[in-house]
Amino acid sequence: ISGPTSQTITIGAGGTPTTGAGGNGTTTSFGALLTLPGGTGAPAPTASASAALSGSYGAGAGGPTGADVGSAGGNGTAGLILASSSALAGTASNSQFGQGGAGPGANAPLSSNGSAGGRGAGGGGGVAVGSVTAATGGAGGAGLIIVWEYS
């Protein structure tokens, strides 16, 4: 860009942790020149009396607009309900700036899951088993913009 005008930088928030479906991350932008969408939170998997296995995962963010080089975010691993008393929370996608949060297995007592280890990474999934109190998923990492100025 030659002779750019002043631009407003907006850093998107990471997805919010919940015991149900995860919250979506919000958009990071550099004025109208660059838009980076936030990732989507995973839907909560539902137990099924007829299925031995049930699961769901969050989709990675869509690709950036206005970037010379860019790519869409990756998907995390699926959270799985294995039986009425056993489940495994999904692990989040990594970014170039940090590791995604881990999703532990679930057998009582449950522990809360990992938050993102860096900007742009996802938070680990939440999990619940039977009548045990659900473990909350981890928070996603906030967005990031790096500006290099050359003269």
Locations of the language-model features?
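A residue-level signal for beta-strand positions that form part of recognition/binding surfaces
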Residues: 27, 33, 116-118, 144
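Short, solvent-exposed loop/turn elements at domain surfaces
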Residues: 44-45, 127-129
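Collagen triple-helix signature
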Residues: 22, 62, 66-69, 73-82, ...
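Secretome/extracellular-domain signature
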Residues: 1-90
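Extended hydrophobic/aromatic segments used for targeting, binding, or gating
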Residues: 124-127, 151
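Short, structured beta-strand segments at or near domain termini in extracellular proteins/domains
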Residues: 139-151
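Short, P/G- and charge-enriched loop/turn segments at secondary-structure junctions
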Residues: 131-135
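Short Cys/His-rich Zn2+-coordinating modules
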Residues: 96
